[in-house]
Amino acid sequence: MTTAVGTPGSAITQRVHSLNRPNMVSVGTIIWLSSELMFFAGLFAMYFVARAQAHGNWPPEPTELNLALAVPVTAVLIASSFTCQMGVFAAERGDVFGLRRWYTITLLMGTFFVLGQGYEYYHLAHEGTTIAGSSYGSVFYITTGFHGLHVIGGLIAFVYLLVRTTLSKFTPAQATAAIVVSYYWHFVDIVWIGLFATIYFVS
């Protein structure tokens, strides 16, 4: 009679193998993100149409975008993609402590981005740039606002995942959830790079 004795190393290997195989959750997430991509494509189209129909300066006075704020805030959001991916690598190894550490850092960086965007909104509104004041104000707040809501959605997902992995035993299902959240976060970051380049650099 033989007895199979599992080792932590073999368990982790099996876990990683199962995570690397396609599953319905990951495929469904990718399909959903494709629809989100179409949504943001519509927002980009709206922005360019408004700009093409505008007369005079773009953005119009008194709007002055704070590039000195937008650059570091954007850099932090881009860097958060790397910390998020480090969390994914930890999840694939079965390292729940590493996952929590990297996802907590990502959560803080994403929060910094949202606060930075809110700070810019406050100053633009104080200067007279409002959503109803001009076509520029409308497309600026709508495009960046919807993106900001998506970022907040990602932050909620990070909080949920951190709480879930803290209150219960770490499982392959939780690792898959961490990977799915990373797909969403990378998507949000890529969209912002496009928005940032369009709004702040394309004249």
Regions found by a protein language model. Name each.
Residues 1-203:
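...captures the hydrophobic TM-helix bundle architecture rather than a specific catalytic motif
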